[in-house]
Amino acid sequence: MPEQNRILCRELSLLAFNRRVLAQAEDQNVPLLERLRFLCIVSSNLDEFFEVRMAWLKREHKRCPQRRLDNGKMPSETIADVTEAARSLIRHQYDLFNNVLQPELAQEGIHFYRRRNWTDTQKKWIEDYFDRELLPILTPIGLDPSHPFPRPLNKSLNFAVELDGTDAFGRPSGMAIVQAPRILPRVVPLPSELCGGGHGFVFLSSILHAHVGKLFPGMNVKGCHQFRLTRDSDLTVDEEDLQNLRAAIQNELHDREYGDGVRLEVADTCPAYIRDFLLAQFKLTAAELYQVKGPVNLVRLNAVPDLVNRPDLKFPTHTPGRLKALGKTASIFDLVRQSPILLHHPYQSFDPVVEMMREAAADPAVLAVKMTIYRTGTRSELVRALMKAALAGKQVTVVVELMARFDEANNVNWAKQLEEAGAHVVYGVFGYKVHAKMALVIRREDGVLKRYAHLGTGNYHQGTSRIYTDFGLITADEQITADVNILFMEITGLGKPGRLNKLYQSPFTLHKMVIDRIARETEHAKAGKPARITAKMNSLIEPTVIEALYRASAAGVQIDLIVRGMCTLRPGVKGLSENIRVRSIVGRQLEHARVYYFHNNGTDDTFISSADWMGRNFFRRIETATPITAPELKKRVIHEGLTMALDDNTHAWLMQPDGGYIRAAPAEGESEADLQNDLWTLLGG
């Protein structure tokens, strides 16, 4: 196969993942309001796609237009391919919302009322709502030499209003801009009595369209057109000019709201001359214009399921399983000292991790606590426990990653609070994101210091721990806990990388470990021995790993990859990858765990990791891979993390050589296997 065809386009692969998410919104087996949520997830993902990936392609085209990307194409060619795929996905999304979801919701008494369908009583209520809630806070900006075109915030809802007449100062009118503040809901619930006892919603854009004339008394409104600008959201911090990383991040967060435009969304009814006017204002081309049949921001519909009390239209509630042994002992440290604990979230509760930190804060025998924070949410019992530990006089060190995309402001806030509580807060190593998920507790026991560590595949975030699937290990293993201590010393101090006993770390040893393990399986296959690699991750795009997997496949290694999102490897290509199979599982839970398995002539080497197989994870982040050696825990990771995922024939998608996906289905006579439901049955409370 030609060199340029061995690697698929990562952006097209990411859009293909979102097509699989959209399939959840189409699936009649998914509860109706959850289908609406999946529709919103696609919109949110697309926003980030344009803010990050499309923005990167545009920058790359400007910087080096002739350079070929990993997929063998130049940036301009890739932009054209990606734009076509994005348009197709967005059209499909709006068709689904308008022609399928809205009618089905209406049958359940959940209505989105358009202006043409408002009853007189609804019109009266909506006008009162506008006068009471909107009119006092809206600020129209008329465009003239003293009022230049305003800079809309990233992803904000705006309206271009065409006017006729002269204002109070005798100025001829032409156009004004109205910006809808973000504090306003994008969908407004109507009183039940106005909706026949059901649930009714109106779009904020419809309310503004109906009453925008009140912002321009005495003027004639000729047209009102919603638009939304998506901007490049990359944060750039110059190391040479850097004095204070936290202050620099705070400044960049403000600037990000006004980055270069990458996408303009308008309704499909917007006239051509308005579209051209807006494109000119934002220095965009027609290729960057997206006309949609409906509201320009479907993301904000995610409020609707929470406003509708219909359990029959939502997923059933699951209760995470709890460690029975934890209730029988006074201390989690006593339990871990006996044997390590493996947690599989969300099927098993995240509470033991929280309890470990709470106990560390209150236990007089605990001398020091260390933890990394990448994403943790706006409310975190874990961070509160760290603050309590610091206030209690313990040595608390927290590595806060300020560059966690779209969580920067939240992490800056936590860093301030932790410092005020007396914790030592460091921001990692400039140029390397700290993505490793690790915590360390140092305790004095019988006159000697004893370490306890938690290492996970997911964030210290109680909210996502109920949605994302992840593994976590709590251990007192002396070599592993010593390794974790070395990693914290590397991050917070200065010096050469320490020699680790069991852990592997990026950017120093993890990539080499993966390449070496693949090569070892390759040699075993050449020698006629059984050889197998099974791995689960979010993304696989690192070219040298892909080439190593191709070599392994050619040697006869059987390779099964469970890749939820981007995968730029081509599976099943004769002479290249016929022994590689790739599947993606998309369901209620977000598959997030990273698990690596290498047969190794029967030793079954198994790791849990924070790292996907991407260049950034191997070379530009601080990551960990932890071996699972305890026989029972290894058996669980292989079975729950890999085997059950390979058996799934309900939510699995099978990747094809061209990068497309086909949904798996039970073979004739085969029973259904549903990874996530089966894990709830196996592990849930």
Curated annotation (Swiss-Prot):
GO terms for cellular component: membrane; polyphosphate kinase complex. One of its GO terms (biological process) is polyphosphate biosynthetic process. Mg(2+) binds at R375, R405. The keyword DNA repair does not apply. InterPro entries: PP_kinase (IPR003414), PP_kinase_C_1 (IPR041108), PP_kinase_middle (IPR024953), PP_kinase_middle_dom_sf (IPR036830), PPK_C_dom2 (IPR025200), PPK_N_dom (IPR025198), PPK_N_dom_sf (IPR036832). An intermediate of this reaction is the autophosphorylated ppk in which a phosphate is covalently linked to a histidine residue through a N-P bond. ATP binds at N45, Y468, R564, H592. It comes from the Bacteria. CDD domains: PLDc_PaPPK1_C1_like, PLDc_PaPPK1_C2_like. Its cofactor is Mg(2+). Its EC number is 2.7.4.1. Catalyzes the reversible transfer of the terminal phosphate of ATP to form a long-chain polyphosphate (polyP). This is Polyphosphate kinase. The lineage of its organism: Bacteria, Pseudomonadati, Pseudomonadota, Betaproteobacteria, Neisseriales.
